[in-house]
């Protein structure tokens, strides 16, 4: 059995070396992606300029001076064009009052439209009329309506005057995106920003010719990034089951040396991005992940947040969620004037600009992440290492004499699992079908096995410390803490490596096993404690058999004190589990948020709260282990397990950069050594007195 254990260790080491190489590739890809772009919404700030009665150019200069690098422009809409004086917009029912609404240069066209509706028995209430006298506007609308309102429009012309009937009610057409005009780009160019970002909207029946036209237009104005507007990406069509248009767009926009980056909207952790913009996963895959993530505070946040709070939101998005485009809209607090909200928005932009530089990043045009290459043969070797860790855990939990009769079955099971992995990873059609599932299962096994190995180490080292009465509690505590974190870190590297595909980094796919990986290692640790130390012992001070211990436990009379302690423990555990993973249910308290914000302001990577609490407790274990009663060391180990699990949990947040995850744990260790050492001195003093 010792030989088998050595073989498992060797395979784990080899797997870890390959995992280290893979996670290094991911780290290098993330390090190349250090350009942050600050984008202002043109319409929002144009409205602010109008309310403050200042020229748009002056508004633009203020934004650029604060740190804004780019301006986002939205597609034309009938309602906006009406407000800008480019056209007139009427509901069909207005034709009932010709003399009131059309007693002008358009009266003849309106009469023709009315006759057409009457002759074709079309109800006025189902119709919208668009009128104007500009040839460029007419040509733009006709070309746009051919695709947006295919087959439901008819137009009338007299000289430059035109009337276009749309066989849809006003509510259904007034806010439909109609595309971008050259005039929109030229006006934005004059404002002096480095980059123009069009907000492109989807519509049914997009053709390759339309894609080519859009690509030519954005290239003409040196556009580098597109952010999709609406609930579907440009090209998403339910009737296009083979996704031919999405594939065409993805390949077109990701051409080498001529790529247009498509931005992915960043939303809360529990939100599936496909529900925000349908088609984004497929388009990202077809564009070889030449994508970046964009974050914008929503209206509810803008109405609530102070400028400091907005900066914290932006900073967290950049450092912890790999966001590289900040989409800026003005603060909108009701108790502030428009001018005050605008000035506070400028303050927030200046503050985040400074923080971006403090993080070691640069302001400029965002770059696409690109494809982080994964080699399935490397994944196979990592898989061997992860499976070996599970069997290694089995061998260190149970005593050798208890496993002897099962050794043959263990060897056979181990071989079957390795053969199964080879079948999945070596046969390409099988890998294409089940590779993702296999990677997620292996990641789940790694989170459970390495956290549990760390838990078993706590038990064994704690027992060893009981016999070392004269040794330094601080040195022993630091050793225990570092080894525990290293074991967990190895598991984290396996997880971060096997899930280092671009789709996980961009959060187009998610690892959902974090809550299970929090609970199971705790149960395994408790099980190992009962087997190795025992809640009940025989006359030789050896742990009773498991079933006998369970029987005695159920027969034990329990006081209210222990019920209360158990209740507190279960509530705390429930909160921790709900707040773990990629689908957080329970939020942090206002005090914790304030503390987090303070740490994030001065540290590039904030130590995670659970680690800040659990790591110092881990350092206390050797000191507490020397108490006659094992109760305190047992409680400390249980609390310390949360910290060990949290190290691996941090790597499960794949969208968080590897550098930030690692640095966060290092900061937690530094704080823990300082705080924990002080606590050890205090506990030692208390022991001397009592």
Which role does the model predict for each range below?
Residues 29-376:
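Soluble extramembrane regions of membrane proteins in the secretory/endomembrane system
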Residues 2-18, 22, 384-690:
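Alpha-helical transmembrane segments of integral membrane proteins
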Residues 328, 341-384, 391-426:
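Large, well-folded core regions of big proteins
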Residues 15-35:
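Membrane-interface motif at the C-terminal end of an N-terminal transmembrane signal
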